[in-house]
UniProtKB/Swiss-Prot annotation:
Stretches assigned to the Cytoplasmic side: 1-29, 94-109, 186-202
GO CC, alphabetical: plasma membrane
Keyword Membrane attached: yes
Protein name: CASP-like protein 2B1
Membrane topology: Multi-pass membrane protein
Family, as annotated: Belongs to the Casparian strip membrane proteins (CASP) family.
Extracellular topological segments: 51-72, 131-164
PANTHER family, per database record: CASP-LIKE PROTEIN 2B1, CASP-LIKE PROTEIN 4A4
Transmembrane segments: 30-50, 73-93, 110-130, 165-185
Organism: Ricinus communis (Castor bean)
Amino acid sequence: MSYLGVGVSPGNVPVYHGSNLKVIDKRVRLAELVLRCLICGLGVLAAVLVGTDTQVKEIFSIQKKARFTDMKALVFLVIANGIAAAYSLLQGVRCVVGMVRGSALFSKPLAWAIFSGDQMMAYLTVAAVAAAAQSAVFAKLGQPELQWMKICNMYGKFCNQVGEGIASALLVSVSMVVLSCISAFSLFRLYGANKGKDCTRW
């Protein structure tokens, strides 16, 4: 079997488009590319803001330095956003290559791989933001019952920069969730294309 002279393996599905579907497909691809670029940029920004954040405070003639490594949740946040940025960069390159080639065929295994990867990145970034946000609340408000003091009263600059990093990471996680929905749409429309093709045969 062939489509426009191109061999089609069982794992590949020719996607037939009407004029309206072509416009939708183009918009979906563009939205995916924009989101991946946004995630890459914000992920790097979040990792840099948190990873380079330090502040030295002198307490009773003793200098104490606050680093992001003092809180494991912030270490997790830096690693997660670094991974998300690298992943989005690779997927962004794939999107650009696909848009330039304008391929009519789409591989189901590739679609599943992209969908699974986006899902994992979404869970990873959301978990990292949740953990970092909880730690930030403790640092800001303290926990009197456990005699945990308000760290941000002493390390104001450090906390402000961490807050900016968490805000960037939050945008990354939200964008990743939206992107996982787009990849789900791109995957399951292939099965819809197969169903529509079978109906036309009858």
